[in-house]
């Protein structure tokens, strides 16, 4: 077994590999850029080597710099994680020449499967079901439009060397095919150093289901069942689960056997994932094979009990798999939610900055439930504009799907993140969505259920009244504390009344509080009531309450005359006032936001790739105005209405902050 391995990656996956290596008694070496000097993976590793400036193109994907770090530390093997150099054949070959073991598949398999055009041809030869499409190289946007018309819209435009949702576009028209081709080509060149593009038919209403395979160097190959990855936004997975709520045993077996057949056909060893799209009749088609560890591998580990990172290391060291196909049973259900530094209220635009608060739920493992959090950040650390915006992968396991979902709801409610925009509210909303709970999902779920983007969650009246009761009870605790603070008028003790008006979500709810030693009963003016008990104290950001015998978790922040309360995806300003205060508050004018309709503002921190118009030019609704690159993704900003460009304030190559002016209209 290896004594020392180097992890050619960063963030949560580097931390994840370090954990398994540490368990196996193997020393670890981290690499880091200037931006990651104080990163968690650097702190966790036994050794760390600096490899360059923040941009990945100058550090994490420079093969020579990784090779220098290997020579400097004497590492015997390298785990590439995912992304960066994980599917780079030249890197695997460089390691082989150096006599260093690559913890992954052999370079011919990487070459064959890393190229989506070649892999599709090989899949067909191996008897794997495939989607119709054009597998040749496409020279320019005109040819892309021509081929798209021959295949028939909609089509999927994809980078041959792509992955992770980068370099992928769905086109429904000639215009979208033309724009999508150029954006995919640019993203592919920036992310993978390979701008080749191919086009295939887009299967409407598909599910994205993938099979985890594991093969050793002794001829053994097994599949560790499937992962359902259909909850996606812009082809980037958001929520995954294992097993799939859609597959039956026969389809699962057929998909697993085809995945192993493909792995054997290319001489594959190590962990790999064969991705399929599955239609409503359970017909499945090969999508691609990822010759690396997947982001979502924890859900497979949770339902099989197999440490995939450990097995990758053991296979690389020449050991045989310790189990056969018949040993790999599905045990329970696992969910994974990807916590991203992106603002769901601003169309999921990337967010950067310092994590002023980062308190994940307590990790635990019992026979009835597991909470696991894979992360690469810590409180006080920074989220950089240079890398993927993922903060953490929150996973839950339980005996049933319903229990795993409920475990995830609670875990999300107790996850505290402040300082940056994040998608926790959106993840909570999906977990509560009836269609998700039912399992009736496709890759179009987010686009169909949130066509205007995420606008927040409106709580049903039953939940709203529980929040109102909790807020009233917490407000009473805060008021009593304020009444007892020293420095008030002598011989005067401020009275805390029982009658309050709770304002939230556009509603005013009149309540009367009857408090006792154990808690408070909050009475509503319609004769109903809620019993609230809690040990919450003013200033605590997380309130764990019991409302009518049921646990309720609220994230709590102080605002004038009340609280900011976040729960189950809802973000509420809850005002708790005396009846007189409520009467006066109704008379107060509301402050109007400034009018920015004549400006194109930068929606995220990023780099201006292109300004598509000129001063004095008339633009039409939907016309491309500028392209901003952030978190390795290109974002095209379009005109919201017809107008004339008065002034352009930014230029290509400029680095902008949120709300910086890009251009002004007449």
Predicted regions and their residues:
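Structured functional modules or segments
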Residues: 592-666
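Conserved nucleotide-binding/hydrolysis modules and their immediate coupling elements
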Residues: 307, 515-521, 525-542, 546-553, ...
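Structured, non-catalytic alpha/beta "coupling" segments that mediate domain-domain communication
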Residues: 77, 87-94, 336, 346, ...
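Conserved bacterial/organellar gene-expression machines centered on ribosome-associated P-loop NTPases
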Residues: 397-403, 408-418, 589-603, 607, ...
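Catalytic cores of soluble metabolic enzymes centered on carboxylation/carboxyl-transfer
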Residues: 259, 298-529, 658, 664
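N-terminal beta-alpha lobe that positions the nucleotide/phosphoryl donor
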Residues: 1-274, 278-297
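Long, charged amphipathic helices and adjacent flexible linkers at domain junctions
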Residues: 323-331, 447-450, 454, 488-489, ...
